[in-house]
Regions:
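Short, Lys/Arg-enriched N-terminal segments with co-localized hydrophobic residues
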Residues: 1-12
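A conserved beta-strand-loop-helix scaffold within acyl/acetyltransferase catalytic domains
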Residues: 17-77, 123-125, 129, 137-139, ...
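Active-site/acyl-donor-binding loops of N-acyltransferases
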Residues: 22, 130-173, 347-408
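Structural preference for beta-strand elements that scaffold enzyme active sites
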Residues: 80-82, 115, 241, 316-318, ...
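Catalytic phosphate/metal-binding cores of nucleic-acid and nucleotide-processing enzymes, i.e., regions
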Residues: 82-84, 310
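A short, internal acetyl-CoA/4′-phosphopantetheine-binding micro-motif in the GNAT/acyltransferase core
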Residues: 86-93, 322-331
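Conserved acetyl-CoA-binding loop-helix of GNAT-fold acetyltransferases
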Residues: 94-106, 329-343
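Conserved GNAT acetyl-CoA-binding A-motif
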Residues: 109-127, 346-357
Length: 408
């Protein structure tokens, strides 16, 4: 075979599929080592304020790559595109990865896309807190290859929370429970009679209330109930809500009865200073709890203290959202709820549970809580931009700023 024929075979080896069947797409992504919930077909339904396309990449008629591309339409017929946690391909094969990326760029140019933002599900470094950070050679090589292919790299930003994720691995579950601080927090939650409830759409209202409380407390805009509903409906039994709750009225009645008993005992031991001191301390504690629950017990029989929304997809899972009623922060319910949510993810077949982003400095408040779960800090390689029209870079930069707002 002549050299020219070999070159032609190499060029025609790959084929981009621009209308991949949804079921075929999802089957490929869900079982792929680099697959991700945010690249699932269902995520396109959740992000219903975007258009979307399912791309496939074939090698000798075999599907070897896929990408769910979210699309926003811009003035004058232009588009902005986003490939969350993708594309999906064997990133250990640099040649194939770059070829797929170039094919996406060429296709995007034909669609008049000014920018294609993507953040592959590739680890640059993975380590437990306190361990040495060792950078993956594969990750470094991939960054270099994508840059050479024309992608603009933004991964150096340590303030980008989506780049740093706290992940719990199934084999580390026993180590979580050996932590002294964690055990203490669980003991408080148990003493406060925090109960666990797993639910779905039937408790959407309670979850949304907790999220709205969190939104108000943090002074940030969060999703509305319809968004959480779409996630639960889209992923069905793969998704769940997990709550921490207390039998509020029952607890209040018990506190009242115990407080009355303590008052009676105090009246009968005026000449026993040590016993009185102990009883007075107990009375103060009971009175504090009484005052804390008095008005709340009039409003509701059961109080929902905190809740999370989680989804299992393939061998991974994500705790996507978490809300809390700050009035019950002393109950330490999140420790118990997150633990049970992680266990539930593993029971549904996941091997890893992603607790969400943390600051790259590893010193933020989020990590103070998440660090109790012995997580692996998965430092992904970060975000890239493809610019199909490089000469329109200034316009593309404005689109990028717009995209950061829109992709939420």
């Amino acid at each position: 075979m002549c050299e020219r024929t070999l070159i032609e075979r190499r060029i025609t080896m790959y084929k981009l599929i621009t209308d991949l069947d949804k079921k075929q797409y999802d089957a490929f992504v869900e079982q792929h080592p680099y697959g991700s919930l945010l690249q699932s077909a269902g995520w396109a339904q959740v992000k219903n304020n975007w258009d979307h396309v399912f791309l496939g990449y074939e090698k000798d008629h075999e599907l070897v790559g896929a990408a769910m591309v979210l699309i926003k339409h811009l003035p004058f017929g232009f588009q902005a595109m986003y490939v969350p946690r993708g594309p999906i391909v064997d990133f250990e094969n640099t040649e194939m990865s770059v070829s797929f990326l170039k094919a996406i760029g060429k296709w995007a140019k034909g669609r008049r896309a000014l920018i294609v933002k993507f953040d592959p599900n590739v680890t640059l470094a993975g380590y437990h807190i306190g361990e040495e950070r060792i950078v993956s050679k594969q990750g470094e090589m991939l960054v270099q290859a994508f840059r050479q292919a024309g992608a603009v790299y933004h991964g150096e930003n340590i303030d980008m929370k989506p780049r740093f994720q706290a992940e719990v691995h199934e084999e580390d579950m026993e180590k979580i429970l050996t932590g002294k601080h964690f055990a203490k927090m669980l003991a408080i939650a148990d003493k406060k009679e925090v109960e666990i409830e797993i639910a779905h759409l039937e408790k959407l209202e309670q979850f949304n209330e907790l999220m709205q409380m969190t939104s108000k407390r943090k002074e940030v805009a969060l999703r509305d109930a319809s968004y959480y509903q779409r996630i639960l409906e889209t992923y069905g039994e793969k998704a769940f809500l997990m709550f921490g709750k207390i039998p509020l009225r029952k607890q209040f009645d018990a506190i009242c009865a115990e407080l009355e008993s303590v008052e009676e005992q105090l009246a009968q031991c005026r000449d026993k200073p040590k016993k009185r001191f102990t009883l007075e301390e107990k009375r103060a504690s009971l009175k504090r709890n009484h005052d804390e629950l008095k008005d709340l017990a009039k409003e509701q029989e059961t109080a929902y203290l905190c809740g999370v929304l989680a989804v299992v997809y393939g061998s991974g899972s994500e705790i996507l959202y978490a809300g809390m009623d700050e009035r019950f922060k002393r109950y330490m319910a999140p420790y118990k709820v997150w633990l049970e949510a992680i266990r539930q993810c593993f029971a549904k077949g996941a091997k890893i549970c992603n607790m969400g982003g943390v600051d790259g400095t590893l010193q933020d408040n989020l990590l103070q809580f998440k660090g109790n779960f012995y997580p692996v800090i998965n430092e992904r390689i970060g975000e890239f931009d493809l610019l199909p029209y490089p000469k329109l870079y200034d316009v593309s930069s404005k689109c990028l700023r717009l995209l950061k707002k829109l992709k939420k």
